[in-house]
Design a protein with these regions (language model features):
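Extended interfacial segments that mediate partner engagement and assembly in macromolecular machines
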Residues: 65-132, 141
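N-terminal cysteine/histidine-rich coordination modules
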Residues: 1-74
Length: 162
């Protein structure tokens, strides 16, 4: 693990919204939400599917809820930043309790990113203006605190083996 992190303030959560590991609503085992090539800035294609290899459950996304508040711009609503997938709102598979908080990730790539950011002793922001919407800027203090670094990394490794 590197002691230095430069790219974590240029990465956004929507970049990990692909092949999300979730809990199957039918058998409670691991299922996967296939999102295809997802780009949060483009029109959503309706080829998103959830598939469970254990029980055969599968469902294709029919429609994404339109925004209800008239003050919001027109478009579709995807809830991100919570331990649920943004399409079917199923609980993510990679989640665990950590000191009263929830440590979670959409997939193994997201988990690797969290391990890299948390494990870095130096997190550089000076390569460009602050990116307040990036994951590095949005992670909670309990996760990035130096005194909890080893415990968080241990919890991440435990999730990796799930």
């Amino acid at each position: 693990m590197e002691n230095r992190s430069k790219q974590t303030y240029h990465t956004h959560l929507y970049q990990f919204v692909k092949d999300i590991l979730v809990e199957c609503p039918q058998c409670a085992k691991q299922a996967i939400v296939h999102t295809g090539v997802f780009d949060a800035l483009k029109k959503i294609e309706y080829n998103v599917r959830v598939v469970c290899a254990a029980c055969g459950y599968n469902k294709t996304l029919e429609k994404i809820s339109p925004r209800q508040d008239p003050k919001q711009k027109r478009g579709n609503v995807l809830v991100m930043g919570v331990p649920r997938d943004p399409f079917f709102y199923l609980p993510v598979w990679l989640q665990a309790d950590f000191s009263g908080e929830t440590l979670w990730a959409y997939n193994l790539e997201h988990l690797d990113f969290l391990a890299q950011h948390v494990g870095a002793k130096l997190r550089e922001r000076n390569t460009s203006p602050r990116m307040n919407r990036s994951i590095g800027a949005r992670l909670p203090r309990w996760m990035t605190a130096a005194d909890k670094r080893e415990a968080v990394l241990k919890a991440i490794e435990k999730l990796r083996g799930k």
